[in-house]
Amino acid sequence: MNISVNGQSQVPPGFRFHPTEEELLKYYLRKKISNIKIDLDVIPDIDLNKLEPWDIQEMCKIGTTPQNDWYFYSHKDKKYPTGTRTNRATTVGFWKATGRDKTIYTNGDRIGMRKTLVFYKGRAPHGQKSDWIMHEYRLDESVLISSCGDHDVNVETCDVIGSDEGWVVCRVFKKNNLCKNMISSSPASSVKTPSFNEETIEQLLEVMGQSCKGEIVLDPFLKLPNLECHNNTTITSYQWLIDDQVNNCHVSKVMDPSFITSWAALDRLVASQLNGPNSYSIPAVNETSQSPYHGLNRSGCNTGLTPDYYIPEIDLWNEADFARTTCHLLNGSG
């Protein structure tokens, strides 16, 4: 049934024509070559050499629904009378084959080939490439020969089977339009994404490279920041004790920045030992404040391995430790 009226295709509203490659070959092209009636004939016959891609778009329009691709039958025209090359030149340009032909299979059987062509404006070999692309489908000879056994195939059709001058079915589309429509129809199309050109990307990479070069690997034994101190004499008296404890730790990790940030607290700690008590009560520390003794264990070393603060009541030095500490202090003062 031909649904064209005055050259315009008349189809019901919402009609879409999206045949698969197998359907194009086994149903439409096979019936076209075999002169078998097609139930719904929506593919027109055109002369590819007399029409430009934008003209094909108007002639092959189906209904009023927007289309991304257009289908038509075309008879292959030889470029030279005695040759086998196909003439695909138009008034303003030409169709040039690109890549290898693709084999089309159905149920493991080869049924045809697909050739991809790109439209160039101008004349070869100095044409200007465009966004128009065409897929040209041709039936395999084995499918054509098997069609001769059908009772409704004309004898004249079998006489031309296997020749290179047969019919082909073509699909034409524009690359940019197809990509835009695919993006707009995707679920994530409503999300706005910034557009970057090559120059912008190069600038970003250059900035990222500079920022990476500017990074410095810090020495774990850099000088500690200035401490809050209220008594210079206290610093002089007890600096040797801290240096001795740190040097004996032999740990590779950086000391916690919270390690002894208040000399006044350390002064109270040592004074309590000199005055006699063997234990020192450390105020409870909540999660939002840092203990000045965080990371200080019984040997006075900062291991940096435990994140928990000590409980309020801790025996910092036993009696033997207290005696050794007193001797060190007396010798140092002398």
UniProtKB/Swiss-Prot annotation:
Subcellular location, in the record's words?
A: Nucleus
Q: Which residues bind DNA?
A: 111-181
* Any one GO CC term of the record: nucleus
Q: Where are the transmembrane segments?
A: none
**Annotated keywords:** DNA-binding, Nucleus, Transcription, Transcription regulation
Pfam families, per the entry: NAM
- Which first-to-last residue range defines the signal peptide? none
Kindly state the tissue distribution recorded for this protein.
Mostly expressed in anthers. Also present in pollen, base of siliques and inflorescence stems.
- All copies of domain NAC, residue ranges: 11-175
Among InterPro entries, the record links this protein to: NAC-dom (IPR003441), NAC_dom_sf (IPR036093)
Keyword DNA-binding carried by entry: yes
Q: Which GO terms describe its biological process?
A: plant-type secondary cell wall biogenesis; positive regulation of DNA-templated transcription
Q: Name one GO molecular function term.
A: DNA-binding transcription factor activity
This molecule's function is given as: Transcription activator of genes involved in biosynthesis of secondary walls. Together with NST1, required for the secondary cell wall thickening of the anther endocethium, which is necessary for anther dehiscence. May also regulate the secondary cell wall lignification of other tissues such as tracheary elements.
Domain remarks in the Swiss-Prot or TrEMBL record? The NAC domain includes a DNA-binding domain and a dimerization domain.
What is the name listed in the Swiss-Prot or TrEMBL entry for this protein?
NAC domain-containing protein 66
Q: Which organism is it from?
A: Arabidopsis thaliana (Mouse-ear cress)
